Structures are given as structure tokens and as C-alpha cells.
């Protein structure tokens, strides 16, 4: 059968490395390493899963060339000493046996390091933090610069000894080489600062030293921020200029974008379209006639194919997409595109947990980042009936997982459609990518002959009893939180009123005009939902006021979303009222108490109550009572246990495997 995506599966040779297809797993931190910087066996398995899934080239996440000074994480990989070679050798062996090539990214964090982790003041080109509010680094002396150059070369040689097929030098994303390249962070007046040629000198010396150490046949990749997307930073045109000073020994450019201060363009926000950066790779490729990797929210294989066919890039880089589905390449190659579990770019598990919380990565759509779909190999050892109440993402995950291991499974959903809150929120234009997850889950459910779905059906005790359950999963979701505030319950979500929850707003979404200049919007609640409402109306030109009881709007958001929403609030002039509490609701104004204890009125054309969600358990207590004298276990998962994020519900849905094991079905 002829493959629909011939360009994706065309091999390519770079020096002596031949890659079997054009899909590259781009480097992305995991926090899976050991605290001493060694590669853990969990870590090795993580990369092997992606190699088994068909990925052509895996570029391992950034490894420190000079620890502790150059480290940017408590579990970051190290390649600065020979004692790290054995585990890295094992990694290369594990990836190679599946036909994939493997490279490793070499890096020095510079000012992106933290003194609390490295035990010393971070260093950089100048005494400029790598992001607003960051630590002030110490400018490097010339002899220190040359020492670091040598460390890059030594690290590259180790990579070669380990069995890596190539190395990538990280020259973007606010790490040390980027700090020299960027006029934002490089204020030097010596031969390493000022002109583009001088700012590129450090990168040039590093690349030349790496080439000297690895010889003429070993591929060198360089990752760049082609456009820093910050005021005063390098534009694409600036980058095209400075690349001339070190492109000679570079075999492949990995063309990214953004700095720490524009992280929403570095780790793409979810509203950015598939392949939005590909024009940057095309510009680099056309000027320097070098193979280029393009990255940027690429989830759809047709987009990837079109980029390659159009000559915009030579490789398609995927980081989060392969966290979400290690089998992405195999599914595309063998015609199972509908089975792809697409990343929704929520940045919660991969960026939020890793960067914000310094924890190992997780994934909203993939509850088993390391083990993939291996659980399906084991089937229940005796008949088991599982009844799942609620067809949102948590309920769907539980139902599908139970059916996939052989349970006879019944899914009961009150509404006409499956997908729950994720499907609803995806109707907000900037959140449409979110629909990929419930759509995938619905498709997955449709393929399971032992999963029976009842829609437009309210679960009752009698109905559940009739299905003879061995295990019951309650996944009935959540509803908006509406506290007992004067006027609120009389007005919110009522016909003819101007006060609504986000659910009612979405129901009316097509009624709001595209041009809302001069109209006033007031939002009570500065969490994720309130910010979604803010984005919708500011983009239509409305004047928006946000009210939050806490000292900060966006508390608890992942760093990518937080940076993005802060930028949007500044761009659109959103009025932020923090430490402010709602006292009364009227049809054209909110009455609030400000931090000084004074009463204020906030007039609006439309007012929105976005105070989060609360668990909704309409039948749980009845089920508990009805099955109290039986061996039937009832588990409550997702938002119906406690309103949180999709990621927790997905994990709890997959945990049906633990429930089955507890009852000796597995």
C-alpha cells in the first residue's frame, strides 16, 4: 500500500548518519535523571518507547557540559565526566536496536541556572538575568569562556564514545550561548559583545572545538531561537546575519524561537497553529543551504507532510507530541492516523510539573508516559463487569482501559454527546485544540466491541443494578461554583440577564459580536477559566476588568500559560483588581470590597462568574447505600471526586487497572 505521507518516510543522510524517516524527537527536559546527573533506567525506557514507536532520530534532552556551574536542574543529565558514559552507552544501545538514530544536546545553562541548586552565583555574558525577576549573573572572564569552550569539546567526544550518532549544541532559549547571541543579555564591550560577529564569537569557538574533537564525519546540530520574539531581541533577520559567523561546521540547524521571557513561543501555547514556525526554518535553509528541523505544535501528519513537500524544512521536530503518543510515527506509517493521541499543548504535565514544580514530567492525554500501551497485553483472568457513570475524559479513560483489558464495560452518559467539560471548553476559539483529546477518546471507545455506551441516559440505582456490576466508576464531573452572594443566584445564567458562568457564555458564544469596542466586561475569578473568558473578549476589543480574591491573577498556572496571559493582559490593558472580594451581584454591575475594605462598583455590559468548579455527584450517595452490603467497589474519579484539571482525571481513569488488580482480576 502506498503511504499517504511519502516525504515523512523518506530517509535522509547527514554526513555518515542515515535517518530512516524525517521525524525527530526534539530535546525536552524530563526530570527523570538521577540526582547525580546519571541517566536512570526509567529514563532509558522513556526514550526506548519513542524509538520503538518509529521515531527516526531522538535528540536526548540537554546534558550539562560543566556541572555544577552549567546545570539548570536538580536531576539534569551530565556529560562532563567519564563516569556518565556507561548509562549513556546503555541508552544508545536501547535506541539503536529499534532502528532509530540518537543524538544528545550539549548545554551550559548560564544565567538560567539557580544559585539555590548549583551553590554559586550563575554566570553569563553580562550581569543581566535570563528573565524578568531572575537572579543577576556574574559576567564571565575571558579565561572562563575558553574553559567552557573546552568543556563543550570534551562533552562532544564523550557523546561519540557513548555511541551517539550526532550531537546538538543548544544556542537558543536563554541558555549560555543564547545569552551571548542576544543583545538583550549581552552588554559586553570586548570581542564577545557589541556587533553580531562579536556576539556570535562564543558560539563559533564552541562549534569549532566540537568539530575538532569529533572529527569530520560526525554530524553537528545547532539549536537556535531564530526569532526571540521580545522587544530588543534578535529578529529572524538578525539571526540570519549572525549565523554566517559559525555556520561552516554546522550540519543541521534546529530552528526554534523564543526566550525565557517569551516562553509561550518557545514551548508553544495551545492556540498557535501546527507548524507556525516553519517559515523560520525555510528562511535559514534558503540562505545557508543546510538541512533544517522545524518545530512548533506539529500534531497533524498532513501538516508535517506539506512542510516537507514544500521544502520549508528537512525534518519535523516533535517534543510534546511524542510524549503524548510514543507511537505517532508507527500510527502514521501504517494508516492508523485516527488512533493518534494528539498533544493538546496544555503544558501542564510537561512544562508545569517540570519547570514550575521541579517534578518528573506527566502528560494530560497520556497517563503512562513510560509504559505506553503495554497494559493491553494483560487481560482479566475471569469475567468482570465494569459500569462507568459519566462520559467525560476521566470516565472515557476508565471505560476504555477496562474494556481494553477484557472487561465487559458499560458507559452511561446523561448528555447527547461524550467528552464532558473538555469538549465544552474547546468551543472557545483559542481552545479548539483541546477537542483533539475527547475526539480521540470517543474514537477509541467506538472500536471496542465490549464497551457499551448509553447516551442521553441518567444513571439510576436500578439501571446500574441491572448491569450486574463488579466495579462501579463514578465520573460525573463538576459544575460551576456559585457561593451564596446577594443577587448571584437570582441572575446568573437566567434568560434575559447579563450575568453568566463560563458554561452559559460558551452556550451563547455565537451571539457575541466580533467587534465589541467600548463594551465593558467584568470577570469575577482570576483562575484559568476567568483568563479564558478574558482572552475571548479582549480579542474582540472589549474593556475587561478582572476581580480576584487572592493577591495574584493566574495563581497555579503553568509557566507557559502564565507568561502568555500576562502578556495579553498587558497588551489589552486589562484592569486587575486583586485582594478584592465580590459582595453583591446586580444585572449591570458587581459590588466588591477592595483591599482597603472600601466598597466599589464595577459596571459592565456582560458580567461573568468564574469561581472555579465543584464536584457533582448526583447519584453517588444512593449507589453507596445500595451496594453497601455487596463486594462491589465504587470508585469516584476526576472532577466528581474534586474539581481539578484534566490530567488528574485521566490518571485516575487509567487507575482502573489498580482496582482490577486489587480484586484479583489482573
Where does each model-flagged region fall?
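Short amphipathic alpha-helical segments
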Residues: 37, 71, 305-306, 329-330, ...
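Flavin-dependent oxidoreductase catalytic cores
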Residues: 1-389, 393, 397-404, 408-409, ...
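Beta1-alpha1 glycine-rich phosphate/pyrophosphate-binding loop at the start
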Residues: 388-456, 481, 526-560, 564, ...
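Short acidic active-site motifs
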Residues: 303, 459-463, 645
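Short, contiguous acidic/charged loop-to-helix segments that flank catalytic cores in large enzymes
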Residues: 267-273, 376-378, 383-384, 424-436, ...
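Glycine-rich dinucleotide-binding loop and its adjacent helix/turn
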Residues: 366-379, 447, 453, 481-540, ...
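A conserved FAD-binding loop/helix module that cradles the flavin
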Residues: 533, 557-558, 627, 637-666
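A Rossmann-like FAD-binding core segment of flavoenzymes
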Residues: 435-481, 490, 495-519, 539-625
Amino acid at each position: 500500500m502506498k503511504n499517504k505521507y511519502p516525504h515523512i518516510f523518506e530517509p535522509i543522510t547527514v554526513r555518515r548518519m542515515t535517518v530512516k524517516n524525517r521525524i525527530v524527537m526534539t530535546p525536552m527536559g524530563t526530570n527523570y535523571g538521577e540526582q547525580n546527573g546519571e541517566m536512570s533506567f526509567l529514563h532509558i525506557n522513556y526514550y526506548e518507547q519513542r524509538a520503538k514507536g518509529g521515531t527516526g532520530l531522538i535528540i536526548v534532552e540537554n546534558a550539562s557540559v560543566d556541572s555544577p556551574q552549567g546545570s539548570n536542574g536538580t536531576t539534569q543529565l551530565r556529560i562532563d565526566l567519564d563516569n556518565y558514559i556507561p548509562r549513556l552507552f546503555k541508552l544508545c544501545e536501547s535506541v539503536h536496536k529499534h532502528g532509530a538514530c540518537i543524538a544528545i544536546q550539549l548545554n551550559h545553562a548560564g544565567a538560567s541556572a539557580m544559585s539555590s541548586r548549583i551553590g554559586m552565583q550563575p554566570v553569563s555574558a553580562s550581569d543581566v538575568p535570563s528573565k524578568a525577576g531572575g537572579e543577576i549573573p556574574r559576567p564571565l572572564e575571558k579565561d572562563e569562556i575558553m574553559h567552557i569552550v573546552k568543556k563543550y569539546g570534551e562533552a562532544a567526544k564523550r557523546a561519540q564514545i557513548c555511541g551517539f550518532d550526532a550531537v546538538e549544541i543548544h544556542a537558543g532559549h536563554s541558555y549560555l550561548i543564547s545569552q551571548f547571541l542576544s543583545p538583550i543579555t549581552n552588554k559586553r564591550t570586548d570581542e564577545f559583545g557589541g556587533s553580531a560577529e562579536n556576539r556570535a564569537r562564543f558560539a563559533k569557538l564552541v562549534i569549532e572545538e566540537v568539530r575538532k574533537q569529533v572529527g569530520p564525519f560526525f554530524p553537528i546540530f545547532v539549536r537556535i531561537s531564530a526569532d526571540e520574539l521580545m522587544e530588543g531581541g534578535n529578529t529572524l533577520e538578525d539571526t540570519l546575519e549572525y549565523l554566517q559567523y559559525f555556520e561552516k561546521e554546522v550540519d543541521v540547524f534546529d530552528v526554534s524561537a523564543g526566550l525565557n521571557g517569551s516562553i509561550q513561543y518557545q514551548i508553544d501555547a495551545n492556540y498557535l497553529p501546527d507548524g507556525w514556525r516553519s517559515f523560520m526554518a525555510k528562511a535559514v535553509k534558503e540562505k545557508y543551504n543546510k538541512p533544517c528541523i522545524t518545530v512548533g505544535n506539529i500534531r497533524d501528519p498532513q501538516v508535517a507532510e506539506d512542510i516537507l513537500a514544500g521544502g520549508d524544512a528537512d525534518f519535523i521536530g516533535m517534543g510534546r507530541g511524542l510524549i503524548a503518543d510514543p507511537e505517532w510515527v508507527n500510527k502514521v506509517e501504517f494508516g492508523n492516523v485516527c488512533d493518534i493521541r494528539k498533544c493538546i499543548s496544555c503544558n501542564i504535565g510537561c512544562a508545569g510539573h517540570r519547570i514550575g514544580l521541579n517534578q518528573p514530567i506527566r502528560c494530560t492525554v497520556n497517563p503512562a508516559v513510560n509504559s505506553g500501551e503495554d497494559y493491553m497485553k494483560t487481560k482479566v483472568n475471569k469475567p468482570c463487569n465494569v459500569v462507568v457513570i459519566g462520559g467525560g475524559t476521566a470516565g472515557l479513560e476508565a471505560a476504555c482501559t477496562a474494556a481494553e483489558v477484557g472487561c465487559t464495560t458499560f458507559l452511561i452518559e446523561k448528555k447527547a454527546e461524550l467528552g464532558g467539560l473538555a469538549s465544552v471548553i474547546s468551543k472557545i476559539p483559542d481552545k479548539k485544540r483541546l477537542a483533539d483529546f475527547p475526539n480521540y477518546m470517543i474514537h477509541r471507545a467506538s472500536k471496542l466491541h465490549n464497551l457499551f455506551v448509553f447516551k442521553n441516559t441518567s444513571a439510576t440505582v436500578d439501571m446500574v443494578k441491572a448491569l450486574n456490576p463488579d466495579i462501579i466508576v463514578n465520573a460525573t464531573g463538576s459544575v460551576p461554583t456559585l457561593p451564596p452572594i446577594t443577587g448571584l443566584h437570582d441572575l446568573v445564567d437566567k434568560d434575559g440577564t447579563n450575568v453568566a458562568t463560563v458554561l452559559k457564555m460558551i452556550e451563547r458564544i455565537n451571539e457575541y459580536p466580533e467587534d465589541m469596542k467600548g463594551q465593558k466586561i467584568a470577570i469575577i475569578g482570576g483562575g484559568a477559566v476567568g483568563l479564558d473568558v478574558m482572552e475571548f473578549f479582549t480579542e474582540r476589543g472589549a474593556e475587561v476588568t478582572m476581580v480576584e480574591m487572592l493577591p495574584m491573577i493566574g495563581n497555579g498556572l503553568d509557566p507557559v500559560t502564565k507568561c502568555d496571559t500576562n502578556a495579553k493582559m498587558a497588551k489589552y490593558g486589562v484592569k486587575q483588581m486583586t485582594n478584592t472580594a465580590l459582595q453583591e451581584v446586580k444585572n449591570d454591575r458587581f459590588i466588591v470590597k477592595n483591599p482597603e475594605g472600601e466598597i466599589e462598583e464595577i459596571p459592565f455590559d456582560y458580567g461573568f462568574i468564574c469561581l472555579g468548579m465543584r464536584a457533582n455527584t448526583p447519584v453517588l450517595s444512593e449507589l453507596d447505600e445500595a451496594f453497601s452490603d455487596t463486594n462491589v467497589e465504587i470508585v469516584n474519579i476526576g472532577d466528581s471526586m474534586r474539581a481539578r484539571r484534566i490530567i488528574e482525571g485521566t490518571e485516575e481513569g487509567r487507575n482502573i487497572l489498580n482496582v482490577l488488580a486489587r480484586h484479583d482480576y489482573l
